Design a protein with these regions (language model features):
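Asp-based, Mg2+/Mn2+-dependent phosphohydrolase catalytic module
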Residues: 1-31, 38, 42-43, 48-113, ...
Length: 181
């Protein structure tokens, strides 16, 4: 199950700081968009996302988007940012993850993936030899397939928190009940 366990959890993308990344030897960050940086309904990045991405790039962290969503949505989100982007990525397949690392001129050991799903973002990161950082979903998506995946994720996260009790708890049911993190 280690291939599915995140290397770190954060309560928000904003908690992933340029200082922490560079201190950990991470010089490239591959980002999911939907439910990681913005809700599915949010067409463009808000000011907080823009400021965070600006701080990362200013610190020398190379950033790109790897999304399973379609081209129109991803292109519109990236329009004002101008970052490297690959859409219809078919995560957890490796082809486009490797293409994005090549676009960022990054090796697996200096790369991290940031996303809200274990079976796409975290597993993809580990399959290419990079680190995987997990954030809670911005909005619960209620389609049947996503609900099924979230149920499977619960068991993985339960084991993760037994081994990492001080890690920020990204489980929606814990955050809603006001657990201290």
């Amino acid at each position: 199950m280690a291939r599915f366990a995140p290397d770190a959890t954060y309560l928000s993308y904003r908690d992933v700081t340029p200082e922490a990344l560079t201190a950990a030897g991470i010089h490239a960050l591959i980002l999911d968009i939907d439910n990681t940086l913005a809700s599915y309904e949010q067409a463009e990045p808000d000011e907080a996302v823009r400021a965070w991405l600006g701080a990362l790039t200013e610190a020398g962290v190379r950033v790109g988007f790897l999304s399973n969503n379609h081209g129109e949505r991803v292109t519109l989100f990236n329009k004002t940012l101008g970052l490297p982007v690959l859409f219809d990525a078919h995560k957890p397949l490796l082809k486009n993850a490797r293409r994005m690392m090549a676009a960022l001129n990054a090796t697996p050991s200096e790369t991290a993936f940031l996303g809200d799903q274990i079976f796409t973002d975290i597993w993809t990161a580990h399959r290419v030899g990079a680190r995987g950082f997990l954030v809670p979903p911005i909005k619960d998506k209620t389609d049947l397939f996503t609900r099924f995946k979230r149920r499977l994720e619960k068991g993985i996260l339960r084991r993760y928190y037994k081994k990492n009790p001080d890690a920020p708890d990204v489980r929606p049911e814990r955050r809603q009940k006001g657990a201290s993190v």
